[in-house]
């Protein structure tokens, strides 16, 4: 947690020191700074080379193309890595709360390296060996694809995305969406620490994220309940 130690603004912080802390800790909370909502991206621009595309369903905030709402509602939001199934998977996620609620609304955090470290040998070997197969739909215009239309093959044209793991890709120009399959590991090797981390969307509740139609192993089999229960147990113990 970084708090102001004087009357200086958040823009006076030492960039190199902030980057160094972030590389070491993986998460920073800037607390107590006076920052206007119109200056949020002025600050994030200092540390951001490029902004990833967000889901079309999320509205812009404060007339800023790089600021978006989170999904509204009271649904449970299981642990996941933002957009891990897309070509726009971000390296950094910024959160800004303009008016904090008095109760609930917290963003959960968990270190994927710690999750993997706490896996037993069998579980580590399982995910080192097996890739996850995602069925994905990505709307690319504001008139989002109707779920009833998604299951049809009419108006689908073969498409191509140059991204390792994506195949069976199709585009629907009438209803403005892409459909594809993505194979990728549930594990990644982190750039800074050079350690393996458990980072994926395996714990989401299907039908809550409209872009993920299905998830299986690459042989089309479901991950066993025993494995999923162990993942959830370890993740819950490490989530703050």
Give names to the regions the model predicted.
Residues 1-10, 17, 62-66, 73-79, ...:
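Active-site environment of non-heme Fe oxygenases that use a 2-His-1-carboxylate facial triad
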Residues 1-83:
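N-terminal non-catalytic cap/leader segment that marks the start of a structured domain
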């Amino acid at each position: 947690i970084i708090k102001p130690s004087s009357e200086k603004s958040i823009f006076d912080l030492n960039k190199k020191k902030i980057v160094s802390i972030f590389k070491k800790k993986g998460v920073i909370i800037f607390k107590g700074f006076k920052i206007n909502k119109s200056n949020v991206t002025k600050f994030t621009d200092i540390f951001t080379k490029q902004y990833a595309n967000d889901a079309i369903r999320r509205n812009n905030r404060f007339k800023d193309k790089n600021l978006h709402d989170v999904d509204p509602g009271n649904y449970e939001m299981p642990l996941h890595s933002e957009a891990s199934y897309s070509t726009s998977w971000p390296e950094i996620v910024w959160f800004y709360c303009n008016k904090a609620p008095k109760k609930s609304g917290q963003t959960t955090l968990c270190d994927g390296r710690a999750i993997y470290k706490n896996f037993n040998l069998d579980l580590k070997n399982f995910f080192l060996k097996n890739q996850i197969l995602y069925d994905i739909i990505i709307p690319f215009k504001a008139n989002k694809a109707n779920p009833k239309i998604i299951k049809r093959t009419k108006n689908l044209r073969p498409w191509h995305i140059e991204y390792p793991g994506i195949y069976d890709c199709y585009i629907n120009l009438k209803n403005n969406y892409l459909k594809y399959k993505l194979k990728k590991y549930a594990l990644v090797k982190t750039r800074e620490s050079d350690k393996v981390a458990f980072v994926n969307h395996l714990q989401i509740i299907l039908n809550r994220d409209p872009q993920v139609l299905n998830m299986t192993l690459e042989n089309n089999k479901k991950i066993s309940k025993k494995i999923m229960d162990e993942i959830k147990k370890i993740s819950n113990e490490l989530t703050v």
